Amino acid sequence: MNTKIYRPALTLYKANAKGTGSAMKMELHPAHDQMSGCIMMSLASQKTVGDYRGPNPIYPTFDWENPITVKLDFIDLSKMLQVFRGEYESIEDGRGLVHRSPSGLTYVRLEHLVEPIPGYRLDVKLCDGVVIVEQRSIMLMPYEALGLVAAIESSLGVICFGVPMVENS
């Protein structure tokens, strides 16, 4: 029997007419064996501008070959949920999350905005020491944040405990 395995993912595309938009993909990685689960979050820059005129629209494209990707564990996701739920205006009073990796430091900042447009701004910066090497940002509307809250909350069980399996003996 062939079992097809897929990785659940949610992608939000935020293209604009200037070509400065971005997209965010959140991919669920359940806990297994002795490994904790996580959500791998990738942000990609917009590569091309779309053209919706005429009968054959041209859709914008995104640079998925060069995203900034960060692993969000249970604690990281819990801190993001606190901002989305309105318990805090930002993660760690604006300091955000800091992740160390062989490629440098990655900073993740999430803040609630009221003006000029209500929503949430998510910034991810990859730094080599103190120099910012790459940076991606995405603006999330309140309804997108609401959906993300539901998606993250429903993922926490498998992030913590994995997918229950019955072992055939």
Residue positions per predicted region:
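Positively charged, low-complexity terminal tracts
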Residues: M1-S169
